[in-house]
Amino acid sequence: MSKQRVFIAGHRGMVGSAIRRQLEQRGDVELVLRTRDELNLLDSRAVHDFFASERIDQVYLAAAKVGGIVANNTYPADFIYQNMMIESNIIHAAHQNDVNKLLFLGSSCIYPKLAKQPMAESELLQGTLEPTNEPYAIAKIAGIKLCESYNRQYGRDYRSVMPTNLYGPHDNFHPSNSHVIPALLRRFHEATAQNAPDVVVWGSGTPMREFLHVDDMAAASIHVMELAHEVWLENTQPMLSHINVGTGVDCTIRELAQTIAKVVGYKGRVVFDASKPDGTPRKLLDVTRLHQLGWYHEISLEAGLASTYQWFLENQDRFRG
């Protein structure tokens, strides 16, 4: 039996590289990988020619233009245009070249700013989005709807998963535009090295957030991709939509900061600056559907933070930022 030829779009990113690591351990797939220089995903002709020549069986669509609040506010046109082009080019070229299985990786920012907690898949398009990343979120919603529409019109098997906040190896540790976990890991690391008496964390520490290690995300992605078609249909009708991926467990930012301090070995005080904004009080995905499909996360937050910090220590000379 010939191996399945699997294209991972975005194989150098945090999620794509985690999917690659797990698939490389298997003997039943042949990975097809292209760097940005080798294949410009914004070029529809280049993407079509790639699919026409490579005989791809499955696609993991993990490529995206990503960034923090400042980047989203400064370059909204780039975020909506580039993400919609990447998705449109890959999904359409996959269809034109008879690739029947594809998994699109979205983001929990697709849900309304004031969505009911925990956020079920049915909350999609039920309210106004968070303004700071609306263009990016709309592009991700378009990706879900592209998959859904090619399924409905052409009978394709294009699936979507929506991850919660991710962290792990190959994250962005830039001091000013990274997400909360890499930002705090770096800050506590530097405070420890400098023997700083305290570390100030923005906000009251009371907001609750959910975090998933990227290796768990990769495992969930492969699990969902490999579900029997009938099982997928049963769990995503009537619109063949998407599946949330998370832990179903959240923690306060205070608990997160204290756990990071423990992992890093920081002995000073953790101070919360309540004059700084907190953001949404709670953001948690409803993962009932994922659990019904037989997948549960395996990496605890503390264990995941410890392994991520170890990766940070080993890659300080080359990490992003």
UniProtKB/Swiss-Prot annotation:
Coiled-coil residues: none
Record's protein name: GDP-L-fucose synthase
Predominant location category: cytoplasm
Compartments where located: Cytoplasm
Gene that encodes it: fcl
Protein's UniProt keywords contain Cell membrane: no
Family stated for the protein in its record: Belongs to the NAD(P)-dependent epimerase/dehydratase family. Fucose synthase subfamily.
Residue positions binding substrate: R187, W202, R209, D278
Annotated effect of mutating R187A: Decreases affinity for the substrate GDP-4-keto-6-deoxymannose
Keywords, ordered alphabetically: Cytoplasm, Isomerase, Multifunctional enzyme, NADP, Oxidoreductase
Function: Catalyzes the two-step NADP-dependent conversion of GDP-4-dehydro-6-deoxy-D-mannose to GDP-fucose, involving an epimerase and a reductase reaction.
Annotated InterPro entries: Epimerase_deHydtase, GDP_fucose/colitose_synth, NAD(P)-bd_dom_sf
Catalysed transformations (reactions): GDP-beta-L-fucose + NADP(+) = GDP-4-dehydro-alpha-D-rhamnose + NADPH + H(+)
Effect of C109A: Nearly abolishes catalytic activity
Activity-regulation annotation: Subject to product inhibition by NADP and GDP-fucose.
GO-annotated biological processes: 'de novo' GDP-L-fucose biosynthetic process; colanic acid biosynthetic process
Activity across pH: Optimum pH is 6-6.5.
Annotated binding of NADP(+), by residue: 10-16, 36-41, 105-108, 140, 163-166, 179
Swiss-Prot/TrEMBL site (Important for catalytic activity) positions: S107, C109
